Amino acid sequence: MKRILIAPVRFYQRFISPVFPPSCRFELTCSNYMIQAIEKHGFKGVLMGLARILRCHPWSKTGKDPVPDHFSLKRNQEGE
């Protein structure tokens, strides 16, 4: 199941992302965050990844935002 959820993200990383300049505001890119969240939390990781994408905009804070060990849709402020 996790492999099926990760496949579209890998497709994006391989074929779509290289066409555009880097724009993620976080140290762990949003696509890598999504993959790690899915690996840790399964389907809930998709929700976490989508919430992360919504947080990634020009007016958000930058920096580290690792995948938390528990399910959360909020930014992991570890290290701040």
Curated annotation (Swiss-Prot):
Belongs to the UPF0161 family. Could be involved in insertion of integral membrane proteins into the membrane. It is a peripheral membrane protein. It holds the Pfam family YidD. Residues 62-80 have a biased composition (Basic and acidic residues). One of its GO terms (cellular component) is plasma membrane. HAMAP family: UPF0161_YidD. Keywords: Cell membrane, Membrane. Residues 61-80 are annotated as: Disordered. It is found in: Cell membrane. This is Putative membrane protein insertion efficiency factor. It comes from the Bacteria. The keyword Membrane applies.
